[in-house]
Design a protein with these regions (language model features):
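N-terminal glycine/serine-rich phosphate-binding loop of ATP-dependent small-molecule kinases
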Residues: 1-95, 148, 203, 219-225, ...
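Glycine-rich phosphate-binding loop of ATP-grasp-fold ATP-dependent ligases
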Residues: 93, 173-180
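Active-site phosphate-binding/coordination module
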Residues: 68-131
Length: 459
């Protein structure tokens, strides 16, 4: 009797968009279901992401899927800096925090108790982009939350708990610009003891660990612990035979990973930090909200019906866009008027937006001392204008895109068989040499220095 084919499932929670992947055992995509994150509030005051509603959505989809397909394993990957607080009755007090809420109300006080940067390698960030800052805010404004809390769960581990009834933590999430982790000692940082929450953090388990099971239409689905999203993207390439590379993971956030960057080269004010991969290795990173800025500029400049970019030397002599149009990242918020640029054609405006995002990316790669091969992943791989300009700017490096976009969802699928090495199918990006983009980057960066747009340390 032929054995029934089993399928795996990945829940990929981005800050805006959510995808549920049904995957064949070889990790090829069978079907994708999509939705968006919704919000609700704690006591009508703290804006939260509505994780319980999201669970209802994907459980309904799993029931539909399981009628036609035999399911094997499930894993969740999610963006950083969202926490769930669970009480003694195993009920949610908060599920889950939204890092774009103003958790930094007490930033000046919080900064005084922080471990030094050379221990956590995590800068003081805006809003709730540090988990420690979220905890400090709650201790000041809503102390009853921490008092009632039995366990604090990261977003992927909240999802896995709801399915498996097992409480867990995971290193790639705990170590992601949280202030929770001391990279020098590979232990929890001193702030955990100051908050007195060590016992509220469940046991750290491997991202690929099967922590429980759930029955869907009488079919057993094994639940994996789960992983931080951009670390899932990194894992796909890390778990190949590629030894030395810089990865640019794109989406709402553009995150640059380069294991060759030295920890001592990280600068807190430039949004540089240290992540940890699923194996526990330190990974120096730098980030900015490239996807968010791109969308914001498309909206501000009212760009529609784009056929192709119209980038000329005459255009670049007159117009350039300067940072920045989103929070976080290495640059201050923009005060630039876009009125003159708004009068240009759609194709000209689109070209300037592409150049702006690529210039910021080039700046980040310079600061990260990236001199190895560069791999692009995520939506940026579909933007032919940007990747060719980047290839022109990084003339001493080779830039590759994978034959298929990996992203966080397919990156997380590697956890289903962590021992298997990936075969990469890389295509080199050829440069656009019609214009000397390095010349215009130098003009752009000189203006940034004159305008003093580079961030000073926060706090």
């Amino acid at each position: 009797m032929q054995k029934e084919t089993q399928f795996n499932v990945v829940l990929d929670i981005g800050k805006t968009n959510v995808k549920l992947y049904l995957l064949h055992k070889n990790n090829s995509v069978v079907k994708i279901f999509k939705t968006k994150q919704k919000v609700h509030f704690y006591k009508r005051k703290i804006k939260l992401l509505d994780a319980p509603q999201l669970i209802d959505w994907f459980l309904k989809k799993l029931k539909i899927i399981s009628k036609k397909h035999s399911l094997n394993k499930f894993v969740c990957t999610a963006h950083a800096c969202s926490l769930a607080f669970i009480d003694e009755k195993d009920e949610e007090i908060i599920a889950v925090t939204d890092y774009e809420y103003q958790f930094d109300k007490f930033a000046k006080e919080y900064k005084k108790i922080l471990p030094s940067f050379n221990k956590t390698y995590t800068p003081l960030l805006e809003g709730g982009l540090n988990l420690g800052q979220q905890i400090y805010f709650l201790s000041k404004q809503f102390p009853e939350v921490l008092k009632k809390t039995k366990f604090i769960l990261s977003y992927p581990q909240y999802i896995s708990w709801k399915l498996s009834n097992t409480f867990s933590s995971e290193i790639s999430y705990i170590g992601c610009h949280s202030h929770f982790w001391n990279h020098s000692s590979s232990k929890y940082s001193s702030i955990i003891n100051k908050f007195k929450i060590r016992k509220k953090l469940p046991k750290i388990r491997k991202a690929w660990k099967i922590i429980g099971k759930i029955k869907i239409n009488n079919k057993v689905l094994k639940i994996l612990n789960g992983v931080h999203d951009s670390n899932a993207s990194y894992l796909y390439f890390k778990n190949s035979n590629l030894k030395n590379f810089t990865l640019i993971s794109s989406g709402t956030w553009y995150i640059i990973f380069n294991q060759k960057t030295k920890l001592k080269e990280l600068k807190a004010n430039l949004d540089m930090l240290c992540n940890i991969d699923v194996f526990g290795n330190t990974v120096p990173t730098m980030r900015f909200m490239g996807g968010r800025e791109f969308d914001e500029l498309i909206k501000k400049l009212k760009i529609t019906a784009i056929n192709r970019h119209s980038i000329t030397k005459d255009l670049l002599k007159k117009y350039l866009i300067y940072p920045s149009f989103a929070s976080a990242g290495p640059f201050k918020k923009s005060t630039q008027s876009l009125n003159l640029i708004k009068k240009l054609s759609n194709n000209e405006k689109y070209g300037l937006v592409c150049i702006y995002i690529t210039f910021v990316l080039h700046f980040c790669l310079n600061v990260m001392n990236s001199n190895n091969n560069i791999i692009l992943d995520g939506p940026i791989t579909k933007n032919n204008t940007m990747i060719k300009i980047l290839s022109s700017l990084r003339s001493k490096q080779k830039i590759y895109i994978h034959s298929k976009e990996i992203g966080t969802g397919l990156g997380a699928s590697i956890l289903f068989n962590i021992k298997k090495k990936n075969n990469l199918f890389l295509t080199e990006v050829l440069p656009d040499n019609k214009i000397n983009y390095e010349h215009y980057y130098d003009l752009w960066f000189n203006q940034i220095k004159e305008k003093k747009l580079v961030n000073i340390p926060r706090g």
